[in-house]
């Protein structure tokens, strides 16, 4: 903050007020002043600095002249010294470093023992610890030298800080090694005695160098530790394996490069990022993707190199530096080459290394940013002539308008109001009336042009009054135009300007002098809340002469041409208003903009996105088109500056219409060109020539006018939304699917499009050409609206996600943890900050090394290294309180030593460093934090930590462990503990500090600042901070028990803002130190308070240990362990003083779970299993969705009133009042209290508010939030990293817990269980080198202690409410007026339809039809999902079923299906045609079959959950035998066909209008009833939840009604006689080849006849089977029956079996055999024996169907497949049958080799010697091939039923001397012989159901028998169908259904007619050939049908030919 009052106006503010920036002009000013000559550049700054320097610089000059007398020193710029400063270490601190690492290892080993004890990993005696791999004796010098450098410089800076605390503005002078430093906070001098050079710089430059040394030390230390660990045991260290010596070499090369290239050298460093990116692309992508990018990049580097020298010479001309040498081009090129080579060696083709190196450029220091030059670059960019294309702008506007329409339809179920409907065509008016919009596929660019003409009416209002939300925007503001000179030091200004300024300053009001938004209001005594609205409505902002724009550099920005614009307060508030309106009203319609997501959400989105675009999940659609995908990451050059009024206004005008304003959203474009832009860097004043008015000063570098473009920080949101709309246009024009995430100019775009792969185009080429084409399209689209893509930062890839510096490839994230710990070090915040905060920061930053299973050990060692350094070394040198801190620490350690009876001091320290900070120890990271990130109860966690620690700590005396807990429980009641409501989110990173004290300091600061405010508003509000909590306490003081949360709820429902936020706004940043410097609010007293706070913290442990009462009994378990949960509860209750209080204590997973490594599924615990079979799981993706139970969300039910009307504050206020009503339900006086609060905060009575409140909250709610208030002694907090929150509805553990806790919500215990389990797996894997297959976490019941919510007694004192809410007026949310309320709740009478049905509505749910309502709501919910899925295939695919499992457990299945069917027909009903027509109904149901399978997966997942299954089996027992979604789909569709229509509830909106109008019309036709329309006000999902809640309350128990009917065995498994089923299979014909030719050219016995057939005729006799029909071409009994007789196996092993048809045939041939089944689990294929189940009725003969196995374990080419083959069945593999389709020949041999390995090594199989057989499918190749070693082929079978043109045969293999497989010619000739000689035989029996299923799947609605009439009916249907233009998803790609259907259907019908008309013939290839030759449309047939459809077609053809008479 820059105070402007005259007394201190010349306060020296260093450039460090822009964090981390090294200012060029300041450096120039310092040097020029000290030398008396121009230093870095000859410009106005150096001139002014020489003529009239500022006082501080003069003081520095005097010091400099007295200290340094030498004359012949060479002057250089700071960067030239970098290399020398970095290498300057005169003392070697190696011993200190060794000592620190050794101690760190000792401390870590104790923590490691704790972890191993908890995880039950016993270490053997000869292997003491993995920590021994880090050997202190051989620390490499690339680690130690950086430590020494940092240590010395840090010591110097600390010394300077101590001086400065004592006496502000001191200067210190000291020599380190060969360099002499003169340091002061306003400038430094460095002189090298070695090279005789001298340089001048800002204090920030020295700090930057210190930080760089620290970063390099941290990085190198990490690399060394990690490599030492990995070398000895892979997986102990980090994933990346950088080489330390090389990293060091890189530092040195770059330092020396910068040292010769000066400041200009940083332009090269900036390009390193791109170079590393090109390395990354080289690893992850195919060549064509990466080379283009790499070449662009290298060209860019060379260009930069060529320019450097010229730039430098130009800059230094006329300065001291002019004579210095500048290296030639070749020298620099060589150095640069060296640096790039080193980077390349470091990356070493490893993606983790590359990701890690991405942090690299922050380790090289920072350039000086030249402010004026940056500003000139901005000016240049704005003057570029733009050529815009009108058509493109119009399309852009149309797309933007469409987005808004979609947004309104989705949120408000209506279009926005439109002024000029007549511009729309009939088609759009139809959408308008139907309240819907077309899907992406139906749009064309014409639509956008048409929509661009639409004008909206006002929909949103501008807030009437300014409220604090608007004000609390921490944006700096510029001084107004006449005070602009306050920015520069007065000495720099000419006298006349100085005098005039003093006068202006004196006359202007206080508020104009400030530079912070908040103070702008605080100091305004005429402030009126209605002013802003007037200012905006009258459009005064457009002609405001006072407007000025001052530009400042962005913090830490490397490039030139990015500046940050500031405006005066008055204009700034208009901008804040515009941004706020956008964020609230328009941004929600653009989900792609990332501005609205938090980090965790963002990370989740990225995970989903990279998952979707992973190369592994590519697939073809139903047309067999390959879906090409690519991702494009673009960066637009000068994004903000490229916008002009023309490009902003196309969309801004639309937003203006919606808000009823004029030019509010692009007003800056209208005013800025007329204002002056000025560079307001303190040390860069303009040349004034004595002119005061800046509008009259002539243009120069750093001051210009007529700025045309946009500027950073203007309307980022609007521009991002324009970019989204532009991509919409591109997507529609090119017919591709675009998924984008945008953040301003940074865009990550995924494109996908189905393409045909033709000759010579493989998948990579298809992806590449799509990427390049789309990149061009995007580039051109941007070009048309005046933007240019940056070449070096735009890249295309197949499968690399890159957003905000996080790299994900193949769906795996590369976290680069070293980047996160570069800044770890002592005093990580600031001087005054608590040592405790510093420790917390070290703790949480080092934890980054553990996330995602990186490395526990590296994190431990690094963390303890710095913590030990901080506590034991740095604490002595604390500038304010070093001695006191150290004394206090020694005292604490002495007491600890005595208490535990420890002999050695080092052991005491080891113990203390592992005691959690909550108890006054030195460990900020409690044990649980390495395993889960959030906890409901910190106290229990700390107790658990102590209990584990004392258990493993062997150095303490007997009994001291118990004594410790007794001491803990005998702590005095805390006299000062009051109910403090913490000001911060309890989950924030870093500690709460002492909650009480912090809020005291904050309150003191805020109150004093606020109460000084002359503005009445703020004055009154200030009282709130001093009194509010006490007052709120009084309202509820008579209510017992006091529930800590109750107070908080009260506190939130009264209109308060949190003090913390205001403090930050005033002081500008969170640190107390800044409060000290920048506000007068804190004085010496506060400093003392802060110091005593630190001392209190350090003495906490000694206070705990000082009292120990022996008579306390500790709660213990049977085995003597402590029950931590109870200890913590007792402690919590005792530490409150004189209040009856309910402390909610939750168990800690560390103590309440026993970890067992076992694979027994009977254990009653939570099972975590490994999801891959590799030895380690590092860097692998886990399962895509959690695999235990379903996730639960807090669901609040809010009526569907028009929420758009409410402001954000009003919504929050309603929620808070809802909470209050919920918590205190039934307490006396509650109604009156609520009434007063409602009137005070919302302005309407409770009665009116009631309908708006959320309907319910879960029991969880109290528990969840109660922990946010806790006693003063125990503040703590953890970073939220991953929260998982599961219901264990279905696991056995649920029973155990329900028995104990009843219906109480036990979620709390488990919200971290999964997260913890996964981390445990990862840690066990790191420590032992292999990860357990499975672990079970078994809850220990006595450790789990859950309290019921309390019952409150007593009554409220509501008299205070009025006072509190009137004190708070500025903070109160907007009032609601009755008109608004009426709009929201009253049904509107307008537009009453004449139709009788519309007027008669009644509620669907009337109190007695609970189950029916639930079933109906759920059915409608699923139908809704269907329509959503068909409309937009969006990236953020939701897991729709989640959270609905419990609801389904209560449904009436009959009603469910009926409503589902009815709703479906209404949603998809006919356009034209009679809806009651049977065909129409069939048509809709058949459409359902074609819906994308992801819907069926979700649906089946929910319905097949055990508890839902139990319920549905009351209606249909068959559900018990269903497995997998395919079977479920058929079963469900059968039910739909036969069910009746039912009444459907329809949702109405706030105006009580029906939402789905068109659907209701069809519904009324359908039912033709006179009963009224049944409606519901809630949306379907909310309704379902609410009713489930009611049902549960009614029956008050969770369990689902038990089965009332007993099942007969026949019902569960209908008896099917296998021998009868045998008749469904045709007889097979085959030829056995015994001794075949091995010469490939053999022509022996070739037949001359060659059939030319195109269709797969081999399926002609397979019409009895639906999913697969292998059993029709091959039979075990026919082929190898004799062998089977000899072997007599009891079990057949089928692998690679698909739908199990061959297995079904074998089951019919051998009725007594059992089966083991395996089939590759692939998303697109069957991995369940559906066909087997269909033929044989049930599955009880399949012993092991492979349930629950992962994909790898079902793949016969993977070793694990064979390892797990005996997991259930323990019989030998006597005969294994393999029908797998292998991609290539190698896979076949892989499978054979693995089979051989298995049968030769397996215990079970080896007992049979070599008598084991494998009967497998093989595709013969051109030449004959040898089998793998020791595998022999006995016979080959060629089947008549194989594809004629293929080379498929079946080979029988056994163990023995290896021989050859048959070759292609051999098999081919045998096939032709079979084809010529044999007819296909027909099965004896026809199964009508199967034939019908085949017909239906070929052509929906096709019925048997197929005759002339049936085909005519189908043709008639086609004409009806063509009205449908909806979009379906077919095989993953979206098509317009009507076109797709008519093409396919007409083709099929024509062929069937041809078959009808053809004669009956023998089924052989002669006849088939004749059929094909007589059919004219063969080409069309083959083009329009995919291979699967052709097979179905032939099956149906076979059935027709067979049934001919």
Curated annotation (Swiss-Prot):
Location(s), subcellular: Virion; Host cytoplasm
GO function terms (MF aspect): ATP binding; GTPase activity; metal ion binding; mRNA 5'-cap (guanine-N7-)-methyltransferase activity; RNA-directed RNA polymerase activity
Domain Mononegavirus-type SAM-dependent 2'-O-MTase positions: 1662-1857
Reactions it catalyzes: RNA(n) + a ribonucleoside 5'-triphosphate = RNA(n+1) + diphosphate; GTP + H2O = GDP + phosphate + H(+); a 5'-end triphospho-adenylyl-adenylyl-cytidylyl-adenosine in mRNA + GDP + H(+) = a 5'-end (5'-triphosphoguanosine)-adenylyl-adenylyl-cytidylyl-adenosine in mRNA + diphosphate; a 5'-end (5'-triphosphoguanosine)-adenylyl-adenylyl-cytidylyl-adenosine in mRNA + 2 S-adenosyl-L-methionine = a 5'-end (N(7)-methyl 5'-triphosphoguanosine)-(2'-O-methyladenylyl)-adenylyl-cytidylyl-adenosine in mRNA + 2 S-adenosyl-L-homocysteine + H(+)
Active site residues per record: 1263, 1673, 1779, 1817, 1848
Annotated region described as GDP polyribonucleotidyltransferase, given as residue ranges: 902-1379
Binding sites annotated in the UniProt record for Mg(2+): 635, 745
UniProt-annotated binding residues for substrate: 1696-1700
Cofactor: Mg(2+)
EC nos: 2.7.7.48, 3.6.1.-, 2.7.7.88, 2.1.1.375
UniProt similarity note: Belongs to the paramyxovirus L protein family.
Assembly description: Interacts with the phosphoprotein (via C-terminus); the association of P and L forms the polymerase complex.
Name of this chain's protein: RNA-directed RNA polymerase L
Organism of provenance: Avian metapneumovirus (isolate Canada goose/Minnesota/15a/2001) (AMPV)
